[in-house]
Amino acid sequence: IAVGLSSKVLPHNFNELCDAAVHYLKGEPFTIYPDFPTGGAIDVGKYNDGQRGGVLKVRAKIDKLDNKTLVITEIPFSKTTGSLIDSITKAVEKGKIKARKIEDVTSANVEILVHLAPGTSSDKTMDALYAFSDCEINISPNCCVIEDNKPCFLTVSDVLRHSVDRTMGLLRKELMLRKGELEEQLFFSSLERIFIEERIYKERKFEQSKSQDEVVAFIASKLEPFKDKLFTAVVDGKGKVEYAFHREITREDILKLLEIKMQRILKYNKDKADDLLLKIEAELSEIENDLAHMTDVTINWFEYLKTKYGKAHPRRTEIRNFDTIEVTKVVEANQKLYINRQEGFVGTGLKKDELVCNCSDLDDIIVFYKDGKFKVTKVADKIFVGKNILHVQVF
């Protein structure tokens, strides 16, 4: 619809979603956080439950292989090994990270080796990778959905609640569908029982009927007395159930009775028929109980899903608080600062003038004047700071 209405809902952990669904159904509070198949780590301090305006910090997993090598084994969500290596390479080319070589030895699992330049601190380089490459990225979720034909912004918890309510509705529909099937089965089994036990098929009028319409009318008349009657099914003197027709008898029902073959009629067993009716009625009672306790049914459903599939979906992304990295402390001094005292200029581009010190393009510099005043400014290629300079250094 529009750029601001694009939806970005991040993946979450299967087990945690099942647990959250159960908590919601029980009326308990719950919190869910993203979980990525690529692993890594996340800082959820500003996630804001996935709502628009929130920010999720995502980091790669970097370990020390030895004093001269760092290894990246998990990458941020939405990044590939290729795009991650490209971002590191660009940072190296700009002098922000000191690395001798970047090697991709990924096979079944991610493995990117960062070989450090001689004399480089591995801890400082690790922080620099987070600060200047895609080893750390920010993802801005935007849970925009269509509700009542209008776009609206929800939290992921809201989406979960809607989803759980919909699941309950689907489970109810499944139970109602099965109930209808069983009622039809019970209905026709009862018709069949009457048709055979009352020997309607042996009646003279049945045998002498000249048309199908006459047969149908005759059978309908014989079934009429049973319409409002309670039937009883008993097996071995133990199980007992009473039931009645749940709907009117139609022409199609009678035509279906006429399709019963004589061999089946001859093999008809009343005890087996009663046993079937008892089983149907027992399942119907169970369904009625489930329909009256849909919350418990839905809880059992999510617990079943977790038990069956949960082991295959462990959490892969670690949740923790990230330390703030000050980029000026981890960036390499990749520039040289010069000063032209006579004209009052300082900068990295004044290569013919007086060398002050090494610096990075992210540093601030402080300039002291002979009258006791001072000035702080950013490193630039060439910037006028004024004459009567006493001293200049990185701030």
Q: Predicted segments — roles?
A:
Residues 1-395:
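C-terminal interaction appendages of subunits in large macromolecular complexes
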